[in-house]
């Protein structure tokens, strides 16, 4: 290993670099320098040969110079006493007759990250902007942006900006593109580079001479120009027409976006453009590059929001291949759902049916949900397939089919009879809470059509004590009461037993309150129960299942060829906000927003909870409520990221802890009653980047320590440590209140 005996290695290399016989042999000399670079990249400190490496730069060998420049840029900040020697060497090479040497030296100078280096690189950069060699001008233009970054918050050099604007007329196309990039960086605080009519027309005329990367860049900058007349607009569109046929997907997408933005007043032109890019998009969807394929599929879905069925004739292009990754398969299934019509429905359903038995449970469930979405239009065919899937008696398939049936009978009442005939016997293959809730809901609402409905619910009642999900218990209460109204003789006894358990023994307050509500409602009379439970009502989630209206192209044209179709508009806005602004300390809500009958937390302790230690990048989002089912599902799917114990003595009121947690935006999902043992609490919180923290607090009988278990949906050690710090502060504050 080179790390052992490193001093001997440095001495050996230093001796070799000073050997005149090696210096006389160019290949041997270069090989020694390559050894220095190799050891440097392996982590060995090679700063001891700095002087010898600077001397090695005095050569006509371009390869050797490049290696030495790499070394000097790496170690110059670590050797400030010798860095000036390196700068002088580079400045000298900036005047070398060879343009490759001049450009290489200038690029290396701009890469130095040292205080005060600006005064040394300014004049070489200005000279480079006027150099006859295009390669040197390319490097000098990019060096302007680097020099501006080194200056920090100093004022923008107007003369330098004017020089860069004049270089937009340069004969070298790469210099032009580099000028745009540098101006954008330098003028970032002023809104970026300004594209006026002369610049826009000049760039349009030079487009054919640019490489594909440059074309994509220029198309993005041209979005800032607004034509003055309709005639000018169509002249620009005619110039851009050929780029819709480019072999580069980036150029095609950039040209398409520019077309959509410029033609915002001409919907027929927008539609024609989207028809013309159908071929390139389909080719990208079949690309071997998985990243390109995924992004293309996201853009296809975006286009389908405005042009439903736009790709219907090419539906087979979206059939999934066995070797494709999971995320691409899910996108293709979503697209297939939107391409179904009378001509291809049978083929699409057969394809989706094959996916339902995929080895990936998540993909199989997504395919079943997709069939459920198609069932709103082609009900009979889809219900038949879903019924056949129930016969497979596989837990993950049965669970999703029952959930799909629940949504289907709600939206398509005509299929209720077929669904009710398919349900008997499926309860044996349902174990998770979502499937149980869906089945119980169906038995409660349509139990009069299902012969064994009371007996299935009776099994749930008998096992209610071992049921761990409060949402299942609440659904069971409602379903059994509904079924009691239509089949009272079979349900009266078990309803009484369930109400007794929920009121007298259940520890979850939400379940207990619902049991009390139904008990008191029954005391009022059956007519009142029917009026409340069986009255016509609309569910708030109905809007999620209805067909979304077609969106005009202009509503998403500005998001085309960006990451918005990939992340979603809201999520991307959050990411952009975090990238654009430095993280600030979390701003906690004021305690006055939480109403309480009495001071659960003394004012001095409230101030302590609010004045938490700096949590770095952590900023918990207020009012982030999770359902118990979602919490449970996520909790079971994640591994414990952190565990610890905190000292704990005596009793406390749970409301005190809940109040303190709310102050710091940590929500309580469920909590045991005061004094119960073991005592548990489940908490959730989410930061502004979407990282979710799920927490379990546990107090065992006779134990003087509180056990804390935290799970995280994204592995971020820094934010996890910040969250633990906040949690420790809250619990420590409550401990002081008790004492």
UniProtKB/Swiss-Prot annotation:
One term of GO molecular function: clathrin binding
Keyword list, A-Z: Golgi apparatus, Hereditary spastic paraplegia, Membrane, Neurodegeneration, Protein transport, Transport
GO biological process, one term: protein localization to somatodendritic compartment
A GO CC term attached to the entry: clathrin adaptor complex
Signal peptide stretch: none
InterPro entries assigned: AP_beta, AP_complex_bsu_1_2_4, ARM-like, ARM-type_fold, B-adaptin_app_sub_C, Clathrin/coatomer_adapt-like_N, TBP_dom_sf
Domain of life where this protein originates: Eukaryota
Chain segments carrying region Ear: 601-739
A Pfam family the protein falls into: Adaptin_N
Localization terms from the record: Golgi apparatus, trans-Golgi network membrane
UniProt note on tissues of expression: Widely expressed.
Positions of region (Hinge): 534-600
Bilayer topology annotation: Peripheral membrane protein
Effect annotated for changing residue 682 to A/V: Decreased interaction with TEPSIN
Summary of subunit composition and partner proteins: Adaptor protein complex 4 (AP-4) is a heterotetramer composed of two large adaptins (epsilon-type subunit AP4E1 and beta-type subunit AP4B1), a medium adaptin (mu-type subunit AP4M1) and a small adaptin (sigma-type AP4S1). Interacts with TEPSIN; this interaction requires the presence of a functional AP-4 complex. Interacts with GRIA2; probably indirect it mediates the somatodendritic localization of GRIA2 in neurons.
Clinical note on disease: Spastic paraplegia 47, autosomal recessive: A form of spastic paraplegia, a neurodegenerative disorder characterized by a slow, gradual, progressive weakness and spasticity of the lower limbs. SPG47 is characterized by neonatal hypotonia that progresses to hypertonia and spasticity, and severe intellectual disability with poor or absent speech development.
Family: Belongs to the adaptor complexes large subunit family.
Protein name: AP-4 complex subunit beta-1
Organism the protein comes from: Homo sapiens
High-level lineage: Eukaryota, Metazoa, Chordata, Craniata, Vertebrata
